[in-house]
């Protein structure tokens, strides 16, 4: 049925007022819910959104939330359906205790507009707690003389629940002698009493067991039970009696446990159990009596159970009770006085006071270290104590008063030898037998800065590869100071000096605390081979002490320089040279020679040459020498060969990784008649300087031969004169010249310069003479020539041991087994003005054999036409013109030859040169001496060609 509302304007106003009133009640009213305690998670409480008149869709937009100051985690609202549910366990007893009412107040807040709703959720009690008695059993003692209807109060039970769940009812198990009476003043205060029905007879039933049960009013009911133990007591009317009220006993201290002190006896006129007596200490007796004595309950015998010490307690007063076994029991009393007699049972006591520790190792004699006092609790001779100190220590005891001593310093201290002393002081009394005690005293010796930091060795050798990153760690120095604490705290610093034009601190730095040495900038082997400096170690004592250590840093070479092509034959990388070759030349004809140098040393400067294949002309009738760089024909040229060839020669060193350079050689094949003209035009501006160089080399060879011959004659004459002359006092004798020979692969000849020095008879002078002979076997390192013998060497003599001045590097030893011929080995180092002759690189000229001996092997990049010499790490400068190096390599020989240089102010003989010839050239020169002029011209031409390559 549908009703239609029709009314006037007043009715509409009344309806609107009612709606506003209802909305106000909803907005400011209060909701009430109830939930049982111990409800599970998710238990439904109420549709709070619906009850508040809120739509589910507006709960989230209006920020519907529950705010509660306490217990906000117990209840939660599901914003999807607006249901209030249990979020966690609710324990009413924990929440409200035993309060009759228990509720959780919630504040529900929504925004837009802001509204606050109050919700009370009542927590209903659940009968989840049974009645509980405080004890599991209650004991009652009832005399057999008690009358019927006697009442004995019992302790009731308690229930943590409230309301009907906590209302308790009691019932007693059926019994003939007892019944239960409950007086209920209210539900919370009930008096439970046990009522005696009839008189008890102990002889019939000495004890009774009953069970009291409490039941609450919950659904279902919960119960609790307690056991009642009723003991019937006998009647007793006579107390035990001792013979005397006080006893006195004397006993020595330290008597053995179990020793009888006294045996007591008491009597009781009662009969049976009421006349049986037991002995015990009175309840008021002191604890120390119980600790030292015990009494037998049946016999009354008192014995010792603890050690008796006269010094602690010399008198004990013991109260004894004799109790019969009647009901109720009756007791008699007496007192036992125990006096303790003294014995020598205490060892002396040692006390150390006023310690003055630690003791400085420079303390004066007589310095007081500590005050020592001794004491003995015994009396008489047992308490007289003498004190002594252990022997062989730098201390002694001085008596200052009775039983007081001073420990003083008796001799000098040295902390570095002994840093601490464990002293033993002995105190002995005068008892018989005598007792003694010891005390230990640790005397620490304070350090004084009397030791400087010391390094493990005075000098260290460090090897660092060049091109190191700035700030890299290269070495760590460590100095040890025998002192302690601040005196042993070592700090490190550089001993500043100049390294060339720069300061040492621009190259390296040292960490003050750790001693780590860092390279501040990349080191260059070509610029600096050896960096020698000192590091200072200084302690923090007052005054500070220090020492220095020397570091020799050898910079090892890395392959950081690519081969450089030399002018004028071949330009730099990308350059080219043109050569005209007649077609009539045969196989093996040298067309051109590519020359290159490498600024590195060792294997990094050992160059090899390769001919790059051309894609346009796969059949190239040319090849390049692997180590000489000479481009020669591989066969006879014919008309089928292309008239122009573009040859790409790859120059590569043997470093890791290898660096390369490329030279371009343009070879034009011409007819035989055109070659001389073109060649003359081409070499007009190029061969001229080389021809001049060839002429100079020829003159040098002639000059060296002449000077060498003259020098040999002079030496022979000088030796003959020295042998015939009588020795004069204070004169100088000629030193033993050392004859050093090269191997059979190559030979050197140079002038021999004899140097005489004025001496005063201290010993034979040393000579600067070293001669090289090409005819000795290669394994003969050196031959000692006698002072009165001629310098001519008998080649038939037995080879002697090598001269220790010769040193073989690892690379040279490997090169001794190489099959590479010297004729194919060549390196030409360019000087500032073009190609110039330099000395061979000898990395092994360093003071230490481990200083990076990386010299190439025989034939490995060391060209007889190009020699490069570098001084050892101790002297990085290059040799000037006319100066002889200290050490160099003999081509074809693994030996490193040492030549003494004249002082800087001496005049160098311009006639002293070293000629680097080849094996074939030596043979040709011998033929030249025989008068073969044709062969002489040919040899000159070959020599000119070889020298021009230099």
From Swiss-Prot:
Region annotated 5 X 4 AA repeats of P-X-X-P, chain positions: 774-894
Membrane-crossing residue ranges in chain numbering: 698-718
BP-aspect Gene Ontology terms: homophilic cell adhesion via plasma membrane adhesion molecules; nervous system development
Name of the protein in its database record: Protocadherin alpha-8
Gene3D superfamilies in the record: Cadherins
Chain ranges of the Cadherin domain: 30-133, 157-242, 243-350, 351-455, 456-565, 581-678
Cell location: Cell membrane
Start and stop residues of the PXXP repeats: 774-777, 799-802, 832-835, 873-876, 891-894
Record carries keyword Signal: yes
GO cellular component: plasma membrane
This protein's record includes keyword Zinc-finger: no
């Amino acid at each position: 049925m549908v009703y239609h509302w029709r009314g006037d304007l007043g009715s509409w106003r009344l309806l609107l007022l009612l709606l506003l009133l209802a909305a106000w009640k909803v907005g400011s009213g209060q909701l009430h819910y109830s939930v049982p305690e111990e409800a599970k998670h998710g238990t439904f409480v109420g549709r709070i959104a619906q009850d508040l008149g809120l739509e589910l869709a507006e709960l989230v937009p209006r920020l519907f939330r529950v705010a509660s100051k306490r217990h906000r985690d117990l209840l939660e609202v599901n914003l999807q359906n607006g249901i209030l549910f249990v979020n966690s366990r609710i324990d009413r007893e924990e929440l409200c205790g035993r309060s009759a009412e228990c509720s959780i107040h919630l504040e529900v807040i929504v925004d837009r507009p802001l509204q606050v709703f109050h919700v009370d959720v009542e927590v209903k009690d659940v009968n989840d707690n049974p009645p509980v008695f405080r004890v599991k059993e209650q004991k009652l003692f009832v005399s057999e003389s008690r009358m019927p209807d006697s009442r004995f109060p019992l302790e009731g039970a308690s229930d943590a629940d409230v309301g009907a769940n906590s209302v308790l009812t009691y019932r007693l198990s059926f019994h003939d002698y007892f019944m239960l009476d409950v007086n209920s003043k209210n539900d919370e205060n009930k008096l439970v009493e046990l009522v005696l029905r009839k008189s008890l007879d102990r002889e019939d039933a000495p004890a009774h067991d009953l069970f009291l049960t409490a039941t609450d009013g919950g659904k279902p009911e919960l119960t609790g039970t307690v056991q009642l133990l009723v003991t019937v007591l006998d009647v007793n009317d006579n107390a035990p009696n001792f013979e005397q009220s006080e006893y006195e006993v004397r006993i020595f201290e330290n008597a053995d446990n179990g020793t009888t002190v006294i045996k007591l006896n008491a009597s009781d006129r009662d009969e049976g159990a009421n006349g049986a007596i037991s002995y015990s200490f009175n309840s008021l007796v002191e604890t120390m009596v119980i600790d030292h004595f015990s009494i037998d309950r049946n016999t009354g015998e008192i014995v010792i159970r603890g050690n008796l010490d006269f010094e602690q307690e010399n008198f004990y007063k013991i109260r004894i009770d004799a109790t019969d076994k009647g009901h109720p029991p009756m007791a008699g009393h007496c007192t036992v006085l125990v006096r303790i007699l003294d014995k020598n049972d205490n060892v002396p006591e040692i006390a150390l006071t006023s310690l003055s520790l630690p003791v400085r190792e420079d303390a004066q004699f007589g310095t007081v270290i500590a005050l020592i006092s001794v004491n003995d609790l015994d009396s008489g001779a047992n308490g007289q104590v003498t004190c002594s100190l252990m022997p062989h220590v730098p201390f002694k005891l001085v008596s200052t008063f009775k039983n007081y001593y001073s420990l003083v310093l008796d001799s000098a201290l040295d902390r570095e030898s002994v840093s601490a002393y464990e002293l033993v002081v002995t105190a002995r009394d005068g008892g018989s037998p005598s007792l003694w005690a010891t005390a230990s005293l640790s005397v620490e010796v304070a350090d004084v800065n009397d030791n400087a930091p010391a390094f493990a060795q005075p000098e260290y050798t460090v090897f660092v590869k060049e091109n190191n990153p700035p700030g890299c760690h290269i070495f760590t120095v460590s100095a040890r100071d025998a002192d302690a604490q601040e005196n042993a705290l070592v700090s490190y610093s550089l001993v500043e000096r100049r390294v060339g034009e720069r300061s040492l601190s621009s190259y390296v730095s040292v960490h003050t605390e750790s001693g780590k040495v860092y390279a501040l900038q990349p080191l260059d082997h070509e610029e600096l081979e050896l960096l020698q400096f000192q590091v200072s170690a200084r302690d923090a004592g007052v005054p500070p002490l220090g020492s220095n250590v020397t570091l020799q840093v050898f910079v090892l070479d890395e392959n950081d320089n690519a081969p450089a092509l030399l002018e004028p034959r071949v330009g730099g990388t990308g350059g080219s040279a043109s050569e005209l070759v007649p077609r009539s030349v045969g196989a093996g004809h040298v067309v051109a020679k590519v020359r290159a140098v490498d600024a590195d040393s060792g294997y990094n400067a050992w160059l090899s040459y390769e001919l790059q294949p051309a894609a346009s002309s796969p059949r190239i009738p040319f090849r390049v020498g692997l180590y000489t760089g000479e481009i020669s024909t591989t066969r006879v040229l014919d008309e089928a060969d292309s008239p122009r060839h573009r040859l790409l020669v790859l120059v590569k060193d043997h470093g890791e990784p290898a660096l390369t350079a490329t030279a371009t050689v343009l070879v034009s094949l011409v007819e035989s008649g055109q070659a001389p003209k073109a060649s003359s035009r081409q070499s007009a501006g190029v061969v001229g300087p080389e021809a001049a160089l060839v002429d100079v080399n020829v003159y040098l060879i002639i000059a060296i031969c002449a000077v060498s011959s003259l020098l040999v004659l002079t030496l022979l004459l000088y030796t003959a004169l020295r042998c015939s002359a009588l020795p004069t006092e204070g004169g100088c004798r000629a030193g033993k010249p050392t004859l050093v020979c090269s191997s059979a692969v190559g030979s050197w000849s140079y002038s021999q310069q004899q140097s005489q020095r004025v001496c005063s008879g201290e010993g034979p002078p040393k000579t600067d003479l070293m001669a090289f002979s090409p005819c000795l076997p290669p394994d003969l390192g050196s031959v000692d020539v006698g002072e009165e013998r001629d310098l001519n060497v008998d080649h038939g003599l037995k080879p002697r041991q090598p001269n220790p001045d010769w040193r073989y590097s690892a690379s040279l030893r490997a090169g001794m087994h190489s099959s590479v011929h010297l004729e194919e080995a060549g390196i030409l180092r360019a000087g500032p003005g073009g190609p110039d002759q330099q000395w061979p690189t000898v990395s092994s000229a360093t003071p230490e054999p481990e200083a990076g001996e990386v010299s190439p092997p025989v034939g490995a990049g060391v060209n007889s036409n190009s020699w490069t010499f570098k001084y050892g790490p101790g002297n990085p400068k290059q040799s000037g013109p006319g100066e002889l190096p200290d050490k160099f390599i003999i081509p074809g020989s693994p030996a490193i030859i040492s030549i003494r240089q004249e002082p800087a102010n001496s005049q160098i003989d311009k006639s002293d040169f070293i000629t680097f010839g080849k094996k074939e050239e030596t043979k040709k020169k011998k033929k030249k001496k025989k008068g073969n002029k044709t062969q002489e011209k040919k040899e000159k031409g070959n020599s000119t060609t070889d020298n021009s390559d230099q």
